C-alpha cells in the first residue's frame, strides 16, 4: 500500500493517485464538541508541504465515494484504502465518544450511502493516542444501532502515536478488538527516526497466533534510502508525500520480485504469507 500523505483538498485526491498512490490519508479536524468539520491539518505540518489546504468533511466524503464507486464517471480502480487521520488530540478525551458517533454517521450518509451504491474502499481509522479508544467503541456502537454492522468488514483500526505496543494491545483487548488492526510507526518527514519500534511491530506481526497486528506501515517517508530501508525490513505499506518515489523504488531489481502494489482483491486485514 502506497499511502499518499495529507491529501486534504478534493483536487489533491486525483493528483496523488496520478503519482502512484493506491491509498490516501487525510486529516479529520473536529470542533470542541467532537463534530467532524473539515479535512485539514494546519500549521505546523511536514517539511515542504502546504499545511492549510482543506475541504468540508462531508463534501470530501462525497467526492471519494465517487472515486471509489465502480461505474461512476470519476471512478479510479487504484484507490482501495482511505486512512482517516483523526485529530482527536485537539479535543478533550471526553469528546472521543461523540466524535466516533459523528464520523460513523457521516460515513454512513456520505460514503456508504447506507447501502445504496456507496464507495467500496477499505477504511482505516487512525487514532492518535490510546486514551481516545472510546472513539472506536462509539463508531462500532453507531453502526450497530443504525443497522449497518456489515460495514465493520470494511473498517480497520490503527493507533498512530508511537505508543508502547503492549499498551496498545491492552486497549484493544479491553475493546474486544483482535482483527483488522494495522500498526503505524513514524514521524514527520522533517526528522530522522530509527527502526527499533518498527522492528518490534514487524516481529509481533510475524509471531504465529499474534492477533493484534496484521499490517505495519512506516510514515512519512520522503527519501528513497529510507523507503528502501523500510522495504528491506518487510513493511506492508509506506506513507509518503511523494508516491512516485515509492513507485520508482519498488521497480528496482531488489524489490520488484518481492513487492507489488495492492489491489482491491487484496484483503488489508489479513497477514501476508509468502508462498
UniProtKB/Swiss-Prot annotation:
GO terms for cellular component: extracellular region. The keyword Nucleotide-binding does not apply. GO terms for molecular function: lyase activity; metal ion binding; phosphoric diester hydrolase activity; toxin activity. GO terms for biological process: killing of cells of another organism; lipid catabolic process. It catalyses: an N-(acyl)-sphingosylphosphocholine = an N-(acyl)-sphingosyl-1,3-cyclic phosphate + choline; an N-(acyl)-sphingosylphosphoethanolamine = an N-(acyl)-sphingosyl-1,3-cyclic phosphate + ethanolamine; a 1-acyl-sn-glycero-3-phosphocholine = a 1-acyl-sn-glycero-2,3-cyclic phosphate + choline; a 1-acyl-sn-glycero-3-phosphoethanolamine = a 1-acyl-sn-glycero-2,3-cyclic phosphate + ethanolamine. Binds 1 Mg(2+) ion per subunit. Mg(2+) binds at residues 25, 27, 85. Disulfide bonds join 45-51, 47-190. Its cofactor is Mg(2+). The keyword DNA-binding does not apply. Its main location: secreted. Expressed by the venom gland. InterPro entries: PLC-like_Pdiesterase_TIM-brl. This is Dermonecrotic toxin SpeSicTox-betaIIA2ii. Its EC number is 4.6.1.-. Dermonecrotic toxins cleave the phosphodiester linkage between the phosphate and headgroup of certain phospholipids (sphingolipid and lysolipid substrates), forming an alcohol (often choline) and a cyclic phosphate. This toxin acts on sphingomyelin (SM). It may also act on ceramide phosphoethanolamine (CPE), lysophosphatidylcholine (LPC) and lysophosphatidylethanolamine (LPE), but not on lysophosphatidylserine (LPS), and lysophosphatidylglycerol (LPG). It acts by transphosphatidylation, releasing exclusively cyclic phosphate products as second products. The active site is at residues 5, 41. Belongs to the arthropod phospholipase D family. Class II subfamily.
